[in-house]
Amino acid sequence: MNLTTQISNELKQLSGFSSSTPRHIEMTDSDGLVLGVAVVAVDALSCAFESLTLHVPSLVGNESGALQAWADALSGRVTYLLENIGPIEIDQRSNQVLIRSTPPDRTSTGTQFYEVLLSAQTNGTFLLRRYRAESGQPGRKSVDIHLTHETLHKLVSDLVDTIPQPATE
């Protein structure tokens, strides 16, 4: 069963769930991709979650070029969040790419932004979180991401569809 179908089934089972402590759900597809979502609320149309991870075993040990290709493909395709996203930093030593909202959402009280970390270390990971930085306060706080079920399905599909394919020899 693909990840989109699995997440749909999980959301149906969690309908009505709401908690300050996230419920971690995890799904695996036939290609070994592992999707994890830290859910804090689900209703009939939408959900809120702290983070979304996708472990991609085929990316383990890949050079930053594959991650850069994934970052570019994601940034071009995922245009339906509150802000557009784009790669802002490539760390070739640690094989990581940082993607953020471009530009972030700025208000008089602070700034909110999405942050995605792509990593080819240990288990090849995509990690999505949203942060808020208060004006005049140091640091940032993680805030929940709110999406309709349909938007979450599209995001999961786009993540899977843009994974770089290993080079064939």
Stretches with model-predicted labels:
Residues 126-169:
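Mixed-charge, glycine-accented linear interaction segment located at domain edges/termini
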Residues 68, 86-93:
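Phosphate/adenylate-binding glycine loop and adjacent helical scaffold
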Residues 93-106:
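Short, hydrophobic/proline-enriched secondary-structure or compact coil segments at domain edges
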Residues 33-34, 46-48, 61-62, 103-113, ...:
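Short, surface-exposed beta-strand/loop "edge" segments at domain boundaries and coil↔beta transitions
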Residues 1-5, 107-114, 121:
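Long, charge-dense low-complexity segments
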Residues 34-40, 113-122, 126-128, 155-156:
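Short, structured motif recognition centered on aromatic/hydrophobic residues
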Residues 73, 77-84, 154, 158-162:
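Conserved short hydrophobic interaction patches
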Residues 1-80:
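Charge-rich, low-complexity N-terminal segments
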